[in-house]
């Protein structure tokens, strides 16, 4: 799919090397169709890496998309050049009058804090409310999934005895749903988190549908409002080396770091990772864009409500 991206975004050149079709604004304006408007609220510390990971997956349909990036005003990133943030990101307050066909809200390295103690909790709560009548479908990832479930539905999170770290087999519980069209009976999802939401809390709420889980990592995917909200507790967007980089980073800090499970070939960290989630990750984003955005969003974007 041709993605319409801001001129000079670093991800453009990175993805062109992977033979992924992206276009800048100059080329996109010559095509007489309405692109889908997608906004990414990127809360991850490594902004450029996350941008590239998500754009790689968004590129997997024939639809043109106009991708923009949102930031919270109440938090200043420490790991991304300020020039990059100024060039490619806008504060929520400057975007709140716009409407979008789709939105992705990423994870954040704050999961061990109480939600209300996060310094941008008030602002992100406002964004959660805003998305409900300004976006056709919103995808919440990892910490954002826990935060969205807590804010909208009162679902608590619980600390884990040890970090959920690795790639785990998932079961589709509602295979008839369009989000799983083309899926096998099982698929794999990377996880990297210290907290969880629990199955019994999801099942006790009639507004929520548990659509994928795992005996190892528990709740994986939850759907609400007929597909206008998806909550994914793992990281289908992760590149092949993300868990490896995280493992080596933590090993440099301390010795008592568990190796990511089901990740390295022969479970040997000296060998290359074995990617088992890429095909389903592409299919998941393709289905979300096609069935829950393109098929549902009004042509007149101002009619989203």
Predicted regions and their residues:
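Amide-donor transfer/coupling interface in amidating biosynthetic enzymes
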Residues: 1-74, 89-95, 99, 126, ...
């Amino acid at each position: 799919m041709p993605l319409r991206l801001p001129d000079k975004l670093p991800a453009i050149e990175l993805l062109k090397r992977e033979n992924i079709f992206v276009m800048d604004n100059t080329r996109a304006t010559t095509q007489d169709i309405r692109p889908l408007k997608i906004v990414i609220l990127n809360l991850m510390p490594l902004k450029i890496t996350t941008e590239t990971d998500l754009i790689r997956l968004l590129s997997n349909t024939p639809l043109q998309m106009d991708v923009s990036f949102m930031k919270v005003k109440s938090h200043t990133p420490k790991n991304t050049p300020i020039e990059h943030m100024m060039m490619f990101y806008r504060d929520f307050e400057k975007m709140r009058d716009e409407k979008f066909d789709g939105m992705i809200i990423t994870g954040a390295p704050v999961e061990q804090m109480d939600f209300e103690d996060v310094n941008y909790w008030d602002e992100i709560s406002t964004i959660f409310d805003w998305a409900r009548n300004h976006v056709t479908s919103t995808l919440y990832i990892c910490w954002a999934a826990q935060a969205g479930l807590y804010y909208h539905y009162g679902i608590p999170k619980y600390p884990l005895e040890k970090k959920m770290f690795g790639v785990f087999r998932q079961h589709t519980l509602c295979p008839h749903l369009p989000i799983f069209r083309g899926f096998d009976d099982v698929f794999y999802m990377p996880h990297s988190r210290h907290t969880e939401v629990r199955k019994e809390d999801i099942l006790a709420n009639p507004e929520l549908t548990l659509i994928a889980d795992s005996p190892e990592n528990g709740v994986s995917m939850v759907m609400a409002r007929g597909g206008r909200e998806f909550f994914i507790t793992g990281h289908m967007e992760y590149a092949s080396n993300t868990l490896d980089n995280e493992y080596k980073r933590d090993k440099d800090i301390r010795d008592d770091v568990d190796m990511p499970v089901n990740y390295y070939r022969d479970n040997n960290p000296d060998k290359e990772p074995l990617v088992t989630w890429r095909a389903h990750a592409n299919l998941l984003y393709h289905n979300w864009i096609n069935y829950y955005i393109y098929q549902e969003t009004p042509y007149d974007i101002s009619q989203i409500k």
